[in-house]
């Protein structure tokens, strides 16, 4: 899959904020919501976006040992 500047911007924004809604994402990269959503779905279907995850704070969860 060939990435243009919009695709690259989408990936960059989602790396920093995977919970951003499509409307806000579209505004940040300068697209209207429909084409933005189509691009996100295409990136997901191509496997470039493999998922969305939560990062947990081990200390706040009371976990003192982390095994790798």
Predicted regions and their residues:
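A compositional/biophysical signature of low hydrophobicity enriched in polar/charged and small residues
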Residues: 1-68
């Amino acid at each position: 899959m060939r990435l243009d500047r919009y695709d690259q911007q989408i990936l960059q924004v989602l790396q920093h904020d995977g919970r951003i809604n499509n409307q806000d994402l579209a505004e940040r990269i300068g697209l209207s919501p429909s084409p933005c959503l189509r691009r996100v779905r295409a990136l997901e279907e191509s496997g470039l976006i493999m998922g969305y995850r939560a990062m947990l704070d081990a200390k706040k969860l009371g976990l003192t040992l982390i095994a790798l």
